[in-house]
Amino acid sequence: MTNQTQLSSKTYDTHFAKLTAEQLAENAKKKVIIGMSGGVDSSVSAFILQQQGYQVEGLFMKNWEEDDDTDYCTAAADLADAQAVADKLGMKLHKINFAAEYWDNVFEHFLNEYKAGRTPNPDILCNKEIKFKAFLEYAAEDLGADYIATGHYVRRSGDDNNAQLLRGLDANKDQSYFLYTLSHKQVGQSLFPVGDIEKPIVRQIAEDLGLATAKKKDSTGICFIGERKFKDFLARYLPAQPGEIRTVGGKVVGRHDGLMYHTLGQRKGLGIGGVKGLSEDPFYVVEKDLINNVLVVAQGHDNSALLSSGLIATQLHWVDRQPIRENLRCTVKTRYRQTDIACEIQPIDDDTIRVIFDDPQIAVTPGQSAVFYQGEVCLGGGVIEEQLK
């Protein structure tokens, strides 16, 4: 039995092919648990799944325990929005608290990386450990799901047993960078209903339906920090060690509040004024010297100290779970929304690769992820261990 809503959307009808009676009947045998965040993408994803005939139920995950920062914590409001959408769609909404798993498997790693002077990406780890592990296991084992679904802007191809992860159709919203740790098995157990459409269409469908989330702005910032100031948040968990800011040549040009507050390639927020004997060109972070607690800067966005010829990556995850044994031509992103960089992967061992760029790149940052593609297909990726000069 499906819980297909009586609501309708002309925008949906325009952009999605009408399924045959046989397809609807086949889908009706499948139960899908969709992660409901209280945002517009998961809201519309739930509607799309209903229109496609699936048995659809929602699950709201609470991954962070609130503190006194009630101005910043949106969990209660997000739950209310998710419930309003579920009610509108006539869909059951389950609730689960994964805060303990999140603390152990995501947040502590995040803090340890910052202590080591690296710049981690907790959203990637959250997808790996929470959304496509804890959530997937709970949905399958406790709720009897055949699939989970999320509002991510990615696509999948192939059958459930040999699925590939593809970029989302909306290049501006593509989130495959954040999902590279998934295996082909996890991709095959997941549905991504908005991956085949563009964001404005998602919003229009939500407006057609009168959903509470139709005009809700996209969330920004790290999931557990929300909209609060990153520096203030980090200072509560890690003691800062102020130190000197020096040029590559060793000239002291300022003070920093703590190396953890800065990232390679950063220009804004350094607090360096005009320096006697130096040009007016802006300063950029080129190195974090942990041993001496010195932030090293250089002037000019095209300064050679900013450039890398490649990188070393470890903690590799390939979607097909097969290690790369030969040199491979492909493209790479070293940060989200970056234009693809042509490169060659050179395997060192099963969990370490050298990546050589066709052209030097700026701000290759240890702790961030390098994610590899061949055309539309996301091959996988790894964590940047070091940059190559």
Swiss-Prot record:
One of its GO terms (cellular component) is cytoplasm. The keyword Iron-sulfur does not apply. The record marks 152, 368 as: Interaction with tRNA. It catalyses: S-sulfanyl-L-cysteinyl-[protein] + uridine(34) in tRNA + AH2 + ATP = 2-thiouridine(34) in tRNA + L-cysteinyl-[protein] + A + AMP + diphosphate + H(+). ATP binds at residues 35-42, 61, 151. Its EC number is 2.8.1.13. It is found in: Cytoplasm. Residues 121-123 are annotated as: Interaction with target base in tRNA. It is an enzyme of class 2 (transferase). Pfam families: tRNA_Me_trans (PF03054), tRNA_Me_trans_C (PF20258), tRNA_Me_trans_M (PF20259). One of its GO terms (biological process) is tRNA wobble position uridine thiolation. Its main location: cytoplasm. Keywords: ATP-binding, Cytoplasm, Disulfide bond, Nucleotide-binding, RNA-binding, Transferase, tRNA processing, tRNA-binding. Catalyzes the 2-thiolation of uridine at the wobble position (U34) of tRNA, leading to the formation of s(2)U34. Belongs to the MnmA/TRMU family. This is tRNA-specific 2-thiouridylase MnmA.
